[in-house]
């Protein structure tokens, strides 16, 4: 059980997140992006990488499921007609952009769920986006933006 988790969503939030570090507390820093991970490693700051909480089989399942959804949603009969313009399905134009976005969101959600389950923190300090997801996953943990 960890007293406090400091979640770093991206590099631009890293400096703010590090302000919450206190040597006397049992804290764990977990970053969700590779740039923050590299920077923390360069600074010699102990941390974990969020994706390390997901097993490779789960990563593959997340990737395949996201791909299956994102490359077929616009062909759904219920919405297909709303997306047709001059015989072109506009949903097709969005598939690559949406795939990357949803893949990141789903990976972050699964990572966060596993992190909270494994670490059992008393408190989570995070940025806005991860904070909202954390609140949905763990109603018992004190969460601070």
Regions found by a protein language model. Name each.
Residues 2-145:
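Conserved N-terminal ligand/cofactor-binding loop architecture of enzyme catalytic domains
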């Amino acid at each position: 059980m960890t007293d406090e988790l400091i979640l770093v969503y991206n590099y631009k939030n890293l400096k703010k997140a590090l302000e919450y570090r206190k040597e006397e507390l049992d804290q764990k820093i977990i970053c969700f992006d590779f740039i923050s991970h590299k920077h923390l490693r360069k600074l010699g700051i102990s941390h974990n990488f969020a994706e390390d909480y997901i097993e490779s089989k789960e990563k593959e399942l997340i990737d395949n499921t996201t791909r299956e959804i994102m490359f077929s949603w616009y062909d759904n009969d219920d919405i297909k007609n709303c997306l047709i313009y001059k015989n072109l399905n506009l949903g097709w134009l969005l598939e690559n952009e949406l795939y990357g976005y949803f893949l990141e969101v789903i990976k972050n959600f699964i990572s966060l769920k596993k992190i909270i389950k494994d670490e059992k923190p008393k408190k989570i300090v995070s940025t806005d986006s991860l904070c909202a997801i954390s609140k949905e996953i763990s109603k018992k943990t004190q969460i601070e933006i």
